[in-house]
């Protein structure tokens, strides 16, 4: 009974790490896990983590019961949240434009525009 009460009456955000990658996992409308990439990248051997996330840290802002979060890449401004690669960059997907968006969550909308027209999501 207590578990049911906690699961549905309180909004909880679990902060985890150590995987050297970024992910946000929504368990239900009230529970979310934020797994934050490592500031050391891949153990200081590379300036990116295993998922392409740059070295950096997670930021969390709490105001009452509202939680906002972002990922701050080392050496970049706070709004630096993705890298894109032109078609032909990948041998496996030569016709595709590739976007690596870190700290993404299900509420984000990521679109590709050309001359103001949405070309893909």
Q: Where in this protein do the model-derived segments appear?
A:
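Conserved beta-sheet core of the metallophosphoesterase superfamily
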Residues: 2-90, 109, 118-120
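Short edge beta-strand/loop segments characteristic of extracellular beta-sandwich folds
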Residues: 95-104
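Solvent-exposed loop/turn segments flanking beta-strands in beta-repeat/beta-sandwich domains
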Residues: 105-114
């Amino acid at each position: 009974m207590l578990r049911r009460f906690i699961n549905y009456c309180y909004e909880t955000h679990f902060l985890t790490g150590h995987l050297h990658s970024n992910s946000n996992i929504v368990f239900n409308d009230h529970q979310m896990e934020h797994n934050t990439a490592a500031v050391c990248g891949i153990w200081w051997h590379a300036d990116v983590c295993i998922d392409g996330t740059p070295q950096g840290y997670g930021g969390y802002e709490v105001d009452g019961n509202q939680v906002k979060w972002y990922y701050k890449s080392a050496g970049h401004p706070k709004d630096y949240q993705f890298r894109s690669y032109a078609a032909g960059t990948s041998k496996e997907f030569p016709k595709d434009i590739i976007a690596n968006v870190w700290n993404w969550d299900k509420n984000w909308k990521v679109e590709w525009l050309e001359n103001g027209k949405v070309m893909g999501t």
